[in-house]
Amino acid sequence: MLERKYKMSILYGNAVVGQSGGPTAAINATLAGVIRGALDAHEKGIIKTLYGMRNGVEGFLREDFVDLFSFFDSDEKITLLEHTPSAALGSCRRKLKSHVEDAETYAKMLEIFKKNDIRYFFYIGGNDSMDTVLKLSQYASNHDYEMKVVGVPKTVDNDLACTDHTPGFGSAAKYVATTMKELLCDISVYSLKAVTIVEVMGRDAGWLTASAALPVISGGRAPDLVYLPERPFDPDKFIDKINELQKDHPALLIAISEGIKFPDGRYVGEGLGGRKVDAFGHVALSGAGKVLEELVKDRVGCKVRSIELNLPQRAAAHIASLTDITESVSVGKAAVKYACDGKTGIMVTIDRVGGDDYSVTFGAADISKIANAVRGVPDEYINESSDGITEEGIRYLAPLIVGELNIKYLNGMPEHVVI
């Protein structure tokens, strides 16, 4: 009797998936996981067709869809997607207003859902994308339209609540850590006093900058100083520390988050170009490294340069973490399974299992606990002087960058999928 009731609760129809926010080296692996999960559901007669919306909800409103079952007609093609960086379906930065503020948009989306018999909506993204999942799941429920809306996590910032870490972070962390290790080799060839400042992505959370300390796990030297937005940045202490460290190491490497703030709350990166905001209303940051470069030049007087890692942090699939890509695929598959099991208004989570050996399970959390929340680096991962990462922080980060992909090359260049 219970089995019959369960079967009757299954929704039959089409599914749609989209990608939103900043791309990563692993967001396509998550898309591949959704495709694989949807194909399994298709074999069971649950999902008829999986559509991909181009450019997120913007493409959805244009009904700009691609039939992913038809496009990915071989396992080899799906595997190639797993190794392709950026967002193959295209992305957007659109944040939905509330249904009260923009009733027309929601009514149009509901019309499109009904027209295309869409019963499953998967949205791969970060904080603001989870807000879209929250709003759509509530709207569908309030308008008596049976549909499962599931958030699928993605962000190199690693700042989503209710999950141990996020797909895309491990690969970006591997790139940052590797770049730091190689830079340390480069700056060490001269005996002259010099400072190299590397600016890493991270407006509100310093997870990616923290990964700059990972060269120590392979016997290397970590950057001399690491500054995260979770702690106030004191420019006077910064200069004092440089003068102190250069007594033993003339050439210093310093990692900073783009979102570090002065003690008065101002972003260091606002020192250039004034205050600007992006499409989500967040302060647009750039130039923290340049601001500190000028500070060191004026107050220390040694050779100094700043480097902004910028887009390669999230696009470097050639050095992606196998752990990250494997988990990203599993997250996508789990999203489909949870939806087909009747879950809605949730985000798939990665839950670390305790013990000496690293392993994870894939859970689900209420989307209302995640949307618009930010999970920063905890105090126990930052040293007492606020300029380095503790051993506990290293232990958390280290497993996430393990493993390398077997990438397919063509004429010396990695092959990618273009949808």
Question: Each predicted region: which residue ranges?
Answer:
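Accessory alpha-helical/coil subdomains and C-terminal extensions
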Residues: I112, Y123-G125, D131-E146, T166-R305
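Glycine-rich oxoanion-binding loops at beta->alpha junctions
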Residues: K7-M8, E63-R119, D128, F169, ...
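Short glycine-rich or small-residue beta-strand-to-loop segments that form or flank ligand, phosphate
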Residues: N14-T24, A87-R93, R119-G125, G151, ...
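Generic secondary-structure signature for well-ordered alpha-helical cores
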Residues: R36-I47, N55-E58, R62, R94, ...
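Short glycine/serine/threonine-rich phosphate/pyrophosphate-binding segments
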Residues: T24-V34, F60-L61, K97, E104-A107, ...
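Short, ordered loop/turn segments at secondary-structure junctions
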Residues: S20-G22, M53-E58, R93-R94, G126-N127, ...
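N-terminal phosphate-binding or glycine-rich loops at protein starts, especially the Walker A/P-loop
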Residues: S9-V66
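C-terminal non-catalytic interaction/assembly regions of soluble proteins
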Residues: G269-I419
